[in-house]
Amino acid sequence: LKAIFNAVGRYCPSLAVSVSLLLTVAPSTAVAAATSYPLTLKNCGQEVTFKAAPTRTASIGQSTTEILYLLGLADKVVGTAVWIGPVIEGYEDVNAKVPRLADNDPSFESVVATKPDLVTAQFQWHVGPEGIVATPKQFAELSIPVYVSPADCAAKDNSAGGDGVRHKSFSMELIYQEISELSEIFDVQDRGEALIAKLKAREEAARGKIANADGKLSAVFWFSSAEMDIDPYVAGTNGAPGYILSALGIKNVVSTEEEWPTIGWETIAKADPKIVVIGKMDRRRFPADDWELKMKFLKSDPVTSLMPAVKADHIVVMDAQAMNPTIRTIEGIEVLADAVEKAGLAK
């Protein structure tokens, strides 16, 4: 089972096929209406107006940048920042041509220096009322419109900074809204509709793989830890992992509505999750960002090493981007469904 579960996080033939289908977004048979400019949208509580399709976009956040790539808009991206892992498969060459303003948080000056006519952001933590890069007002003073992913502001309070508090469970509909609105802003609605249709089809296929598992399994998602020997950041019910588990009929042993609460391993062990999902990322802000250190900890710690899921090697390595509210969340559903199916846990 170890080979089955760990390999899924790095390579999965069925997943590779699914991703390859996504990489080229063909126009749908029905022709969507063209955008009528000026276009005004309400985004994260603010009205944003576009006089024409943007030609120079500074994109702060990996997911939103990847959406722009998938919509065939890479040539409109003049700078990007905040990446925690490799670009979506098939877009390595495209991404290499886009200037990286910063792997993590860019400065306001570096964003403005790209001379953007649009700034997109994945998180209000970066561009929002308390944004550490800037506030929308700062960009507005330079006549630069801002678009923030609806997944980070709908039914969510970011006023205290950090991960914020999500008052309603995340749904992929928020990502589909982002795709739809970005495609309207850039007047590529046909591409947006085709991309959404493919993502929905992939989710439906993944759900069908382990339909018999409904209510039989439980899991915990471990994103990272500030230090290896303190309580880990694990997924609550209202974030992307909650959506993944709900889609597959798997119980989350963490019942709090917080997105990423810290919970002790003793408490987690008592809940006895049948599967442990660990995040894989390039980011190294914390020691536990390294998935291999997570794996080593699970197998050597006096508490976690005795957990039945760990002893049975029911550990799934998953791209951390799938654990955030992103287009990769669909990939997370596929990875977990494939792991459960191949291990025979859905029977």
Predicted regions and their residues:
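Short helix-initiation/N-cap motifs at beta->coil->alpha
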Residues: 41-45, 98-109, 152, 257-265
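Extracytoplasmic ligand-binding site segments that recognize negatively charged/polar headgroups
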Residues: 86, 126-134, 144-181, 214-240
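Structured C-terminal subdomain patch of bacterial secreted/periplasmic proteins
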Residues: 169-178, 278-347
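Short helices/loops that flank or line small-molecule/ion binding pockets
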Residues: 108-115, 133, 263-272
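Alpha-helical, coiled-coil/dimerization segments enriched in small aliphatic residues
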Residues: 85-87, 232-260
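Solvent-exposed loop/turn segments at secondary-structure junctions
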Residues: 63-67, 83-86, 118-119, 124-129, ...
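A short, structured surface patch at a secondary-structure boundary
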Residues: 58-114, 118-129, 250
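Bacterial Sec-exported substrate-binding components of ABC uptake systems
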Residues: 2-4, 11-13, 27-66, 168, ...
